[in-house]
Design a protein with these regions (language model features):
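A short helix-loop-beta-strand connector motif used in the catalytic cores of GNAT acetyltransferases and
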Residues: 54, 67-82
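Short, charged low-complexity intrinsically disordered segments located at boundaries
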Residues: 60-72, 94-101
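Conserved GNAT-fold acetyl-CoA-binding loop/helix
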Residues: 46-67
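Acyl-donor (CoA/ACP) binding surface of acyl/acetyltransferases
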Residues: 1-33, 37-47, 80-195
Length: 195
């Protein structure tokens, strides 16, 4: 019975370290740093994200987010991480391995964001490179998927630099910033060479 429980409801992943970054599960104590980084990055992030609710940066909304994160991990649906700069433990962004499908699929979808003041410094590249082995070797996924808006050159570069291959083009794939947007579809398989 313990084996079944481990497979169906894994514990949250431990912190993951990469080149200059540490990834760990978000905690309520991260609220101040998270809300400040998101607020100062609002203009930078909103073209690439779903519309933010009016209370998105409130403590109550963050508390609800923490509850959802815990439930998603408990049920093996998603694994969220905040990304911290290793040298001073400053929050620089976040990523999530979500929409986990078990059974014959063994796949999940990646989402990520980086604060405006930390963009183009290699933090998200290091974070993805650190997460990929855990996704394949610890969570035992076979396939990782990601999608990005065709005009998001930084995201395209990030995915290709971390070994994702473009697989397609999806029309009006996600509602981003209030508009149904086309997306490029990327994937990476367990058998693909590690970057």
């Amino acid at each position: 019975m313990a084996l079944f429980r481990t497979i169906s409801s894994p514990e949250p992943l431990p912190p993951i370290t990469g080149d200059g970054v540490t990834l760990r599960t978000p905690q309520m104590t991260d609220f101040v740093a998270w809300s400040a980084l998101r607020e100062e990055s609002r203009e930078f992030l909103t073209p690439w994200e779903p519309t933010w609710p009016s209370d998105d940066l409130s403590r109550a909304a963050f508390r609800q987010r923490m509850r959802r994160y815990a439930e998603d991990q408990r049920t093996d649906q998603a694994y969220p991480f905040f990304v911290f700069r290793k040298e001073d433990n400053e929050l620089v962004g976040g990523l999530v391995l979500a929409n986990i499908r078990r059974g014959v699929a063994q796949s999940g979808s990646l989402g990520y964001w980086v604060g405006a003041s930390h963009a183009r410094r290699g933090y998200m590249t290091a974070a993805l490179r650190a997460l990929i082995p855990s996704a394949f070797d610890v969570l035992r996924l076979h396939r990782l998927e990601a999608a990005c808006i065709p005009t998001n050159v930084a995201s395209i570069r990030l995915l290709e630099k971390t070994g994702f291959q473009r697989e397609g083009y999806a029309r009006e794939y996600l509602c981003i910033n209030g508009i149904w947007q086309d997306h490029l579809l990327y994937a990476r398989l367990r058998v693909d060479q590690r970057p």
